[in-house]
């Protein structure tokens, strides 16, 4: 009986440790938006902040956009490749090493977390979800490009309800 008690304690300790490692001390600039993001994420995959991604050399990480094609066409993070959510497009992964660093994003992080989980199940080991996703990226003033890779101030807000979290006044919301 004592062995089972020790085993149970070890399993619980491992679970708590691995869960807390995923909950990196990330915050969005706006407290209300940060709380909204936290409410939607399960923290089932590691997260990376927009500052960290912005500072990373562009060729060092594969950036994947898990939104829908019409959202991606309006704007996306420079260097990002469309992978989709409802219309999954795994072609972008062809030839990608399983240990290549990958960052997935969507509007706030919910859809990208689901796609990141899928990638991890496929064997990709260095997958992260962009905390606050493209909304936080834009809110902090980082660049966006359109479908022709030209700079833009337009951002697809998914719908009117979710667009309220695009807080940067220089961004033109589209839905």
Please describe what each predicted stretch is.
Residues 1-4:
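Positively charged n-region of N-terminal signal peptides that target proteins for export
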Residues 6-15:
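Bacterial N-terminal signal peptides
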Residues 16-46, 73-100, 113-175:
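Rhodanese-like catalytic fold shared by cysteine-dependent sulfurtransferases
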Residues 44-51, 57:
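Alpha-helix-centered segments that form part of catalytic cores
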Residues 53, 62-67, 80:
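Short hydrophobic beta-strand that contains or immediately precedes a catalytic carboxylate
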Residues 59-61, 99-101:
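A general structural motif
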Residues 105:
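Short, surface-exposed ligand- or partner-binding patches at beta-edge/loop junctions that are enriched
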Residues 109-110:
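Residue-level detector of alpha-helix initiation sites
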């Amino acid at each position: 009986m004592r062995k089972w008690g020790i085993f149970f304690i070890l399993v619980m300790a491992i679970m708590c440790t691995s869960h807390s490692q995923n909950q990196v001390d990330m915050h969005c600039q706006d407290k209300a938006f940060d709380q909204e993001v936290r409410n939607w994420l399960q923290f089932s995959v590691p997260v990376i902040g927009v500052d960290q991604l912005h500072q990373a050399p562009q060729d060092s990480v594969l950036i994947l956009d898990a939104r829908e094609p019409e959202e991606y066409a309006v704007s996306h993070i420079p260097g990002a490749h469309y992978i989709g959510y409802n219309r999954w497009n795994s072609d972008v992964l062809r030839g990608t090493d399983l240990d290549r660093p990958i960052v997935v994003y969507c509007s706030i992080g919910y859809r990208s977390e689901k796609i990141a989980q899928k990638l991890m199940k496929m064997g990709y080991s260095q997958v992260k979800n962009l905390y606050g996703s493209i909304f936080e990226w834009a809110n902090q003033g980082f660049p966006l490009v359109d479908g022709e890779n030209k700079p833009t101030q337009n951002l697809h807000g998914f719908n009117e309800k979710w667009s309220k979290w695009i807080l940067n006044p220089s961004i033109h919301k589209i839905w």
